[in-house]
Amino acid sequence: YGEGIPMEKLFHLKENNTTVRTEIVAGLTTFMTMAYIIALNPNLLTGFGAEGGSQLWNGVFLATCIASAVGTLVMAFAANKPFAMAPGMGLNSFFAVVVANIVSLTGMSYLQSFQTALCVILIEGIVFIILSVLKVREKIVEAIPLGIRLGIAPAIGLMLLNIGIGSNAGVYSSDGGPFYVMRDFFGALTPSLAKANMGDGYPQMVLTVVTMFVGLFLIVLFAHKKIKGSVLLGMLCASGIYWAGEAIFLHTNPFASLKGASFVPAFGDMAETTLFKFDFAALGEIGWFTVVTLVITFCIIDMFDTIGTLVGLSLIHISEPTRRRG
């Protein structure tokens, strides 16, 4: 249990019926499960690097890493809760839409509109903190039917599953039927059409789909066998299978992208593009009514994301005292 060492004193492992080993495995599993956000967030907010230049991409990338680390450490040491924190898919998607609309409506550069939208996020964050301190958020949670509260987290999970299977792995249901065929990221393709038109991309897509199903099967198998760290082991095995498949069947080096890669954090790019870069002067150009509307919208998205996550992770059930703690 880690008794006699700082881990036990800091996190009350015995009281929470856990061990240092369990926490390490859980931490690694959580990291690998959510690590996609490190690349997805800057890609989403910069149009895969097409908007704002590489400086903005680097700035968002580093900000994502730092914000996730700081948020998770605060949850660990201040709240003593096993929750990892990172940018949410709901908020960042809407943020990208807002930035794009500011560009089209005002003619600002993408970077300036990005920094203007950051002001909206800052205001929304302050409002959200005030609502939490005044326990308004708690009242809102209590007013939501328990069934809806418990359904938010699974709904988010199913959305991510759809994104992962349909967009990344390349699997979708043909005409609403029960059979699945492969597609690329941009649209539906039958296997024969894909093979004829995708060239070298087709074998890679097949390898991706096969690896995904093998990985899922291994996770279920390990869990059925009650092997600790089943999710982590399944992900590691699937990664190894994919890398081996790339080398054997695709005749490519799975680690080629590491050549020439820089491992020095781009603090300069973050300082230039995102660090305290709030363009309050430009808020007037989009109109204060629009600003208020955006703050309210962001606050609602943030609130329901938080409610769904906390309820789902806390396994809050029907008893009234437990519900009030939600």
Model-derived segments and spans:
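Short, Lys/Arg-rich, polar N-terminal cytosolic tail immediately upstream
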Residues: 4-17
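Hydrophobic, membrane-inserted alpha-helices
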Residues: 67-72, 213-219
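Select transmembrane alpha-helical segments in multipass membrane proteins
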Residues: 21-28, 118, 284-297
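Hydrophobic mid-bilayer segments of alpha-helices in multi-pass membrane transport proteins
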Residues: 89-91, 121-122, 152, 156, ...
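P-loop potassium selectivity filter motif centered on the GYG triad
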Residues: 183-201, 258-288, 295-301, 308
